[in-house]
UniProtKB/Swiss-Prot annotation:
SUPFAM superfamilies named in the record: DNA/RNA polymerases, Lesion bypass DNA polymerase (Y-family), little finger domain
Role summary: Poorly processive, error-prone DNA polymerase involved in untargeted mutagenesis. Copies undamaged DNA at stalled replication forks, which arise in vivo from mismatched or misaligned primer ends. These misaligned primers can be extended by PolIV. Exhibits no 3'-5' exonuclease (proofreading) activity. May be involved in translesional synthesis, in conjunction with the beta clamp from PolIII.
Enzyme category, top tier: transferase
Organism, scientific name: Xanthomonas campestris pv. campestris (strain ATCC 33913 / DSM 3586 / NCPPB 528 / LMG 568 / P 25)
Entry EC no(s): 2.7.7.7
Site (Substrate discrimination): 13
Protein name: DNA polymerase IV
Length: 359
């Protein structure tokens, strides 16, 4: 039986800012640029009490908490701390799969230290993070990645939770189905319309029914409802693409997609920074009301060097959609692919990761 730990830093960017600037401690801190198109990169726990969340438009965050302190992101500093944390991970196992600057999966089935109990390994890792970075982390311990990720949220902040193999069903079945990664607001509504509210409800549905309604995602739902996840922890997994997408509650015309494309471009921009990689190809994804999927892409000579550059390319790709004007769209996505190692493009990285996005 595998022993998987998911470690997630607590309000990472905001916590780094509060650590480095004592005047911010105890205050609602929002890591974001101000501006109509800006989105929240991170919110301190004080800010979260006002309903502020990551990826929320910054203007909405400002309305929710006018007294919030807005701090522009400093990704170079966050990356430096992330490297410290990853060094701690590697003391315990070489099987470390970073998901972003602030979270990773670890397979500690055969830990370097010889420690046998995954709970003790997770506790030691969290203690070392606290002592060496003055930051806190939460951890989930389980037999697979899916369960470990859910567990890491259970005792946030600064806690850990274990799902033992013998307790998987007792833990999983009562959960609302939206705790399954990938089940967002729209999917949650579709499942509820079928009478599926909890994981227990989901488990009662046959695979064929779920596939009929949700295609390949139906198979994923079927497996997750049974706590099945055989994906290995893949060390130093290279990011192939980064994207953000939205499914609408009502289908929209093409010319109504611009504000959504702008917001998704910013989410993708920030997500790219967290991966520490550079994407060159801009991809626009659309799904029509009759579920036809279209993608349009453009590869400039150099990667987009600013947020506005990414937005402009993504918006320009809508002009390459040659469908009747009455066509309606139920989903839009913006992505970056064609990633290169930043060390091979140091000059580009300096521009890409060092500049302040245009507002």
């Amino acid at each position: 039986m595998r022993k998987i730990v998911h470690v997630d830093m607590d309000a990472f960017y905001a916590s780094v800012e509060q650590r480095d600037d004592p005047s911010l401690r105890g205050k609602p801190v929002v890591v974001a640029w101000r501006g109509a198109r800006s989105v929240v990169c991170a919110a301190s726990y004080e800010a979260r009490t006002f309903g502020i969340r990551s990826a929320m438009p910054a203007v909405r965050a400002e309305r929710l908490c006018p007294d919030a302190v807005f701090v522009p992101p400093d990704f170079a500093r966050y990356k430096a701390v992330s490297r410290q944390v990853r060094e701690i991970f590697h003391r315990h196992t070489d099987l470390v799969e970073p998901l972003s600057l602030d979270e990773a999966y670890l397979d500690v089935t055969e830990a370097k230290t010889g420690m046998q109990l995954a709970t003790e390994i997770a506790q030691l890792i969290r203690t070392q993070i606290r002592e060496e970075t003055q930051l806190t982390a939460s951890a989930g311990i389980a037999p697979n990645k899916f369960l470990a990720k859910i567990a890491s949220d259970w005792r946030k902040p600064d806690g850990q939770f274990v799902i033992a193999p013998s307790r998987v069903d007792a833990f999983l079945l009562p959960l609302p189905v939206n705790r399954i990664p990938g089940v967002g607001k729209v999917m949650d509504g579709k499942l509820a319309a079928l009478g599926i509210v909890t994981v227990s409800d989901l488990r009662l549905r046959p695979l064929e029914e779920l596939q009929a309604h949700f295609g390949s995602f139906g198979q994923s739902l079927y497996r997750r409802a049974r706590g099945i996840d055989e994906r290995p922890v893949e060390p130093d997994q290279e990011v192939q693409s980064v994207s953000s997408e939205d499914t609408f509650s009502e289908d929209l015309a093409l010319d109504a997609l611009d504000p959504h494309i702008q917001r998704l471009a910013e989410k993708t921009w920030h997500a790219t920074r967290r991966t520490e990689r550079i994407g060159r190809t801009v991809v626009l994804k659309l799904k029509t009301s009759n579920f036809r999927i279209l993608t349009r892409s453009y590869t400039p000579e150099q990667p987009p060097a600013s947020l506005q550059g990414l937005v402009d390319i993504a918006l320009g790709l809508t002009r390459r959609v040659e469908l009747p004007p009455e066509t309606r769209y139920r989903l839009v996505g913006v992505g970056l692919s064609g990633f290169s190692d930043p060390e091979l493009q140091a000059a580009v990285q300096g521009e890409l990761f060092g500049e302040v996005p245009q507002q």
